[in-house]
Design a protein with these regions (language model features):
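Catalytic cores of alpha/beta
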Residues: 30, 112-118
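Active-site-adjacent beta->alpha loops and helix N-cap segments on the catalytic face
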Residues: 82, 135-156
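Structural recognition of alpha->loop->beta junctions
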Residues: 38, 118-127
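Non-cysteine beta-strand/loop elements that form the S-adenosyl-L-methionine
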Residues: 43-50, 124-133
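N-terminal capping/small domains of soluble enzymes
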Residues: 1-100, 106-107
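Short beta-strands and strand-loop turn motifs
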Residues: 97-103, 129-135
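Non-membrane alpha-helical structural segments and their capping/turn regions in soluble enzymes
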Residues: 75-79, 109, 113, 144-151
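Conserved small/polar residues in nucleotide/adenosyl-binding loops
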Residues: 160-162
Length: 162
């Protein structure tokens, strides 16, 4: 088999395949179903500084070609992720070499900065910015729609060593 090792931001990955945020939980849920030695990284479920319940009502709609979802970034918050789920992701990294990626959303620049600062000291390998999730009704949508707003969040977070 071909060697698919690749480098992402200084991290050697088993392959360029990354379990996308929101599709594989925090990885451990799929450990028995996938050969993690062939997966480069896991991008955990989307996080916000403070936990959120997500959207009310119908959140999944099945269609003949797949699913439509409107989850609304339901998550336990950054601190809970650091205390609980990150340890599970880092165990996968130790066993299989999968890079641990945190997916961070926010409702303000300050929330992004505070969440990223906490994650930068947590042991997570990479922080992926969630600036375009269409499920967020306050703040998040605007960052992904306007280049200036997205650029400002990226600029502010580039000052934090992650």
């Amino acid at each position: 088999m071909a060697d698919l090792k690749t480098n992402l931001l200084g991290f050697t990955m088993n392959s360029p395949i990354i379990g996308a945020s929101g599709t594989v939980g925090y990885g451990v849920e799929y450990e028995e179903l996938a050969d993690f030695s062939k997966i480069g990284g896991i991008s955990g479920k989307g996080l916000t500084l403070h936990g959120q319940y997500g959207n009310k009502g119908e959140r999944l709609w099945e269609t003949p070609s797949g699913l439509i979802n409107s989850i609304g970034l339901q998550n336990p918050g950054v601190q809970h992720f650091i205390d609980v789920e990150l340890g599970e992701m880092l165990e996968l990294k130790q066993k299989y070499g999968t890079v641990a990626i945190a997916n961070l959303g926010g409702h303000s620049e300050e929330e992004y900065v505070e969440g990223a600062a906490m994650l930068s000291e947590s042991g997570v390998d990479i922080v992926e910015l969630n600036i375009s999730c269409p499920n967020v009704k306050v703040g998040g949508m605007a960052y992904g729609v306007k280049a200036e707003a997205a650029g400002e969040v990226v600029r502010m977070l580039s000052l934090i060593h992650i």
